[in-house]
C-alpha cells in the first residue's frame, strides 16, 4: 500500500543586516550577517519510496527538475548515505522566489532533515550541514536551525539570542540578479568587521542595499514606504524588504495597508505582495538531527 505524503515546513529567513568584508581568491564574498527564521514559508511534501527513485511529482514554475534544489538535496543524501530508498517530492510555495528570503535553500534543508528521519539515517547535524553547503551558501543555516551570527561565505554559524519581534515583509514583483549585484563595481566589499555588540546597538546595515536601490527604484520605493511605520531594511540581495514591530497587532495593521489599498503599487510602480510573520528562535525540524 502506497504511503501518504508527509508535510514539512520550510521557513523563510531574513538577514537583519549584511556586511561584505572581503572576497576569497575563488570569487566568493566574505560576509557578516544575522539570519533569523520566520514562522512563514513553504511546505515540502515527501512520500518515501521503496524503489530508489527520486521524483518531483508537481512542477515548480520556472524551475526545471534537474536544477530543483529539493531533488538535488535528496539525490545527494541518497548517494552520501548509500540509502536504497527513494522519495516523491513536491513543494507548496509561499515564500516569494528571488526575494532574498532563502526559499529554495530552506526547501532543500527541509528535504535533508526530513529524509534523515524518514530514511532512518541518523546522520548528525554537522554532516548534513556539510552536505547542505555543497547545495548553496544559505542551506547550512536552515539545518543549523537557530538564529545565527553568520560569517565566512555563510558556513560559519554561531547561535545568537534575539528579542521577540514581528515582521512585515513586502516584495515588489521584479527580478533582481544576485550575481549582477555582487558583480557591481559600486558594491562595497571592504566593510570593517563588526561585532555582536555593535549589531545589538543597530550599528549595522546591508551593503547590497545601496546598489539595489540605485538599480531597482521599486525597492527604493518599498523601503521609503515601509520606513513610515518602522525602520525598514532589505533582506539579502532583495527584492524583499522588512520592518520589525513589537506586537503582532502593530505588524498586522501595517500589512492591512499593504493588502487593502492601491496606494502602495501606485507608489512603487509595480505589484507588491506582503506577509506578516513572527521571528522564530528555532527551526520546526531542528530535532530531526542531533
Swiss-Prot record:
Pathway: Isoprenoid biosynthesis; isopentenyl diphosphate biosynthesis via DXP pathway; isopentenyl diphosphate from 1-deoxy-D-xylulose 5-phosphate: step 3/6. HAMAP family: IspE. It comes from Methylobacillus flagellatus (strain ATCC 51484 / DSM 6875 / VKM B-1610 / KT). Catalyzes the phosphorylation of the position 2 hydroxy group of 4-diphosphocytidyl-2C-methyl-D-erythritol. The keyword Transport does not apply. It is an enzyme of class 2 (transferase). One of its GO terms (biological process) is isopentenyl diphosphate biosynthetic process, methylerythritol 4-phosphate pathway. The lineage of its organism: Bacteria, Pseudomonadati, Pseudomonadota, Betaproteobacteria, Nitrosomonadales. Disulfide bonds: none annotated. Its EC number is 2.7.1.148. It catalyses: 4-CDP-2-C-methyl-D-erythritol + ATP = 4-CDP-2-C-methyl-D-erythritol 2-phosphate + ADP + H(+). Pfam families: GHMP_kinases_C (PF08544), GHMP_kinases_N (PF00288). Belongs to the GHMP kinase family. IspE subfamily. GO terms for molecular function: 4-(cytidine 5'-diphospho)-2-C-methyl-D-erythritol kinase activity; ATP binding. This is 4-diphosphocytidyl-2-C-methyl-D-erythritol kinase. Keywords: ATP-binding, Isoprene biosynthesis, Kinase, Nucleotide-binding, Transferase. The gene is ispE.
Amino acid at each position: 500500500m502506497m504511503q501518504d505524503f508527509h508535510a514539512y515546513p520550510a521557513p523563510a529567513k531574513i538577514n537583519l543586516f549584511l556586511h561584505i568584508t572581503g572576497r576569497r581568491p575563488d570569487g566568493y564574498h566574505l560576509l557578516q550577517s544575522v539570519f533569523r527564521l520566520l514562522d512563514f514559508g513553504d511546505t515540502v511534501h515527501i512520500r518515501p519510496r521503496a524503489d530508489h527513485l527520486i521524483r518531483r511529482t508537481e512542477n515548480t514554475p520556472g524551475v526545471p527538475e534537474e536544477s530543483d534544489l529539493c531533488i538535488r538535496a535528496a539525490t545527494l543524501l541518497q548517494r552520501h548515505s548509500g540509502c536504497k530508498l527513494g522519495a516523491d517530492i513536491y513543494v507548496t510555495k509561499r515564500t516569494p522566489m528571488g526575494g532574498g528570503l532563502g526559499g529554495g535553500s530552506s526547501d532543500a534543508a527541509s528535504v535533508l532533515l526530513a529524509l534523515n528521519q524518514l530514511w532512518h539515517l541518523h546522520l548528525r547535524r554537522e554532516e548534513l550541514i556539510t552536505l547542505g553547503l555543497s547545495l548553496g551558501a544559505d542551506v547550512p543555516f536552515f539545518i543549523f536551525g537557530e538564529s545565527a551570527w553568520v560569517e565566512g561565505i555563510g558556513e560559519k554559524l554561531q547561535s545568537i539570542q534575539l528579542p521577540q519581534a514581528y515582521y512585515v515583509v513586502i516584495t515588489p514583483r521584479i527580478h533582481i540578479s544576485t550575481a549582477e549585484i555582487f558583480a557591481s563595481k559600486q558594491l562595497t566589499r571592504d566593510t570593517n568587521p563588526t561585532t555582536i555588540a555593535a549589531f545589538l546597538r543597530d550599528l549595522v546595515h546591508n551593503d547590497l542595499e545601496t546598489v539595489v536601490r540605485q538599480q531597482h527604484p521599486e525597492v527604493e520605493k518599498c523601503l521609503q514606504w515601509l520606513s513610515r511605520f518602522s525602520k525598514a531594511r532589505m533582506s539579502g540581495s532583495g527584492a524583499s524588504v522588512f520592518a520589525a514591530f513589537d506586537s503582532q497587532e502593530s505588524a498586522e495593521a501595517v500589512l492591512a495597508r499593504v493588502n487593502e489599498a492601491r496606494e502602495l503599487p501606485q507608489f512603487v510602480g509595480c505589484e507588491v505582495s506582503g506577509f506578516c510573520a513572527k521571528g522564530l528562535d528555532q527551526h520546526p525540524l531542528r530535532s530531526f538531527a542531533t
